[in-house]
Amino acid sequence: MLRNRITSRRSISSSVSALANYGKPQNPAIDTTVKMRIQPIKREGETMEIKRARLIYQSRKRGILESDLLLSRFAKKYLNEFTEAELDEYDRLLDEPDWDIYYWATKNYDVTPLPDKWKDSKILKMLQEDAKNDDREILRMPELDLEQK
C-alpha cells in the first residue's frame, strides 16, 4: 500500500510537471550564430581605370542574382561618368551585404532599415531610381564591353 502511494505521488508529480511544460521546448535552442564584419580592403594607389574595372566586376559578381542584375545594369549605365568621389562612394556601397543593398535599392526598409550613413547618398538615390525600371525593360546582365576604356 505504501509502495503504491509513493508511485502515485511520483506519477502525479511528473504529470503536473509535464503539463506545465507542455508545448515548451525541452532543450531550448542555443544561439550559436557568430556575427562579425570583415573590414574592406583599403586600396591605395589604384588608378581610376583600374577602380572602374574592379567596380564593374564587383557589380556583376555579387552572388545573388537580384543584386547582380541591379548593380551590373547600374554600373554599365553610370560608372564611366562618375567622378573619383562618386566612385569612392559606390565602392563603399558595394562593401555592404548584398541583401541590404538590394532592399535599400528597392526601398524595402521594413526588411532592412536604411542606416543614417546612406540616407543622403547621391549614388544610392541614383540606384533607387534605376531599380524602379520605369521603362519596364526585361532585366538581363549587360554584355561586357571589353574595348571600353
From Swiss-Prot:
KW Chaperone (keyword) present: yes
Major localisation: mitochondrion
Cystine pairings recorded for this chain: none
GO biological process: mitochondrial electron transport, succinate to ubiquinone; mitochondrial respiratory chain complex II assembly; protein-FAD linkage; tricarboxylic acid cycle
InterPro entries membership: SDH (IPR005631), SDH_sf (IPR036714), SDHAF2 (IPR028882)
GO cellular component, one term: mitochondrial matrix
Highest taxon, organism lineage: Eukaryota
SUPFAM superfamilies hit by this protein: YgfY-like
Gene3D superfamilies, alphabetized: Flavinator of succinate dehydrogenase (1.10.150.250)
Pfam families found in the cross-reference section: Sdh5
Miscellaneous comment: This protein may be expected to contain an N-terminal transit peptide but none has been predicted.
PANTHER family membership: PROTEIN EMI5 HOMOLOG, MITOCHONDRIAL, SUCCINATE DEHYDROGENASE ASSEMBLY FACTOR 2, MITOCHONDRIAL
Name of the protein: Succinate dehydrogenase assembly factor 2, mitochondrial
